[in-house]
Swiss-Prot record:
UniProt modified residues of type N5-methylglutamine: 235
Alphabetically ordered keywords of this record: Cytoplasm, Methylation, Protein biosynthesis
Disordered: annotated segments: 288-307
UniProt protein name: Peptide chain release factor 1
Source organism (scientific name): Xanthomonas axonopodis pv. citri (strain 306)
Processing and modification events after translation: Methylated by PrmC. Methylation increases the termination efficiency of RF1.
Length: 361
């Protein structure tokens, strides 16, 4: 660990001691808001304190074992204890470094998943359907809930476009690096001569905003359309124009919702998603600017960026943002086994963040 990172850890340890003193102050205890805020900050620093205490014990164990190494009768045991202590210190070093990475406050929250067919006609729509099913099955493995808010089926299967809300603790933290253009290479079912076709679909991961009520939108900037659709209301929604399409004219952002029985409920859902998308657009611009400055690939937030290729003939998935990230496990991944892929992306992002922290004073 670099000296800079070590100094940051020491600062966190000192802040923890300060918080412990503050939380015993009667004035702080008597102020519910302040007490709650400081208690939350203290709980976030506890893992750092625990890891530092474990590190101190491991260093003491190492020193004791090294002192015993000079004793011929204890040398073999000492060597074993030295190896164990060094291995533990390496683990703790990595753990402490990861605890330094600033936590995204949105990580535990829900998200909106948007998948749209790109170039490739019917095959692109089928691929968009495959991607949506991949994420839905991954969500099921995680115990999350997937609620479709709007969809436009492809003529030969899949989706021209599908939007869903993914509900579950940690959903955004696991899927936030999936935004971008996904490309597929395979022989379509309709291809009689066995030629490989290339098509694409785009994925957008938008965190559900907790503070959407604080976002003010001028009603004059909105164009609201109603239409008939099928959905949760069954035949009822086919008879009434309960589905809602809202266009935010200044930005061009369009959202739809057609899953509820009433127009009012669909409008409420659509407005929440619109506000979340506008907020995410601003954050994405900032993330993209930072990524450009720091030459980052993972976490850039650029949805036009080609991030991944799925080569069915070779059973291979390549993520273009991380050098050497190619997995020959496409059949399982497309069925929702995304942990290995997501784990590599999270590790790369953590490395980027640690590099930034090391460069900062």
């Amino acid at each position: 660990m670099t000296p800079t990172l070590r100094r940051k850890l020491q600062a966190l340890a000192e802040r923890r001691e300060e918080l412990q003193h503050l939380l015993s102050d009667p004035d702080v205890v008597g102020n519910n808001d302040t007490f709650r805020t400081l208690s939350r900050e203290l709980s976030q620093l506890e893992p750092v304190a625990v890891a530092l205490e474990e590190e101190a014990r491991a260093k003491a164990d190492l020193a004791t074992a090294e002192a015993l190494r000079n004793d011929p009768e204890m040398r073999e045991l000492a060597e074993e204890e030295i190896a164990a202590a060094q291995a533990r210190l390496e683990q703790l070093d990595a753990q402490l470094a990861s605890l330094l990475v600033p936590r995204d406050p949105r990580d535990d929250g829900n998200l909106f998943l948007e998948v749209r067919a790109g170039t490739g006609g019917d095959e692109a729509a089928i691929f968009a359907g495959d991607l949506f099913r991949m994420y839905a099955r991954y969500a099921e493995r995680q115990g999350w809930k997937v609620e479709i808010e709007s969809d436009s089926p492809g003529e030969h299967g899949g989706y021209k476009e599908v939007v869903a809300r993914v509900v579950g603790r940690g959903a955004y933290s696991r899927l936030k690096f999936e935004s971008g253009t996904h490309r597929v290479q395979r022989v379509p079912a309709t291809e009689s001569q066995g030629r490989i076709h290339t098509s694409a679909a785009t994925v957008a991961i938008i965190p559900e905003a907790d503070d959407v009520e604080e976002i003010t939108i001028n009603p004059a900037d909105l164009k609201v359309d109603t239409f008939r659709s099928s959905g949760a209301g069954g035949q009822h929604v086919n008879k009434t124009e309960s589905a809602i399409r809202i266009t935010h004219v200044p930005s061009g952002v369009v959202v739809e919702c057609q899953t509820e029985r009433s127009q009012h409920a669909n409008r409420d859902k659509a407005m929440k998603r619109l506000k979340a998308q506008l907020l995410d657009t601003e954050r994405s611009k900032a993330a993209a600017a930072e990524a450009q400055t720091r030459k980052l690939q993972v976490g850039s937030g650029d949805r036009s960026q080609r991030i991944r290729t799925y080569s069915f003939p070779q059973g291979r998935i390549t993520d273009h943002r991380v050098e050497g990230l190619t997995l020959y496990d496409l059949p399982n991944i497309i069925e929702g086994d995304l942990d290995a892929l997501i784990g590599r992306l999270l590790h790369e992002h953590q490395a980027d963040e640690l590099a930034r922290l090391s460069d900062s004073p």
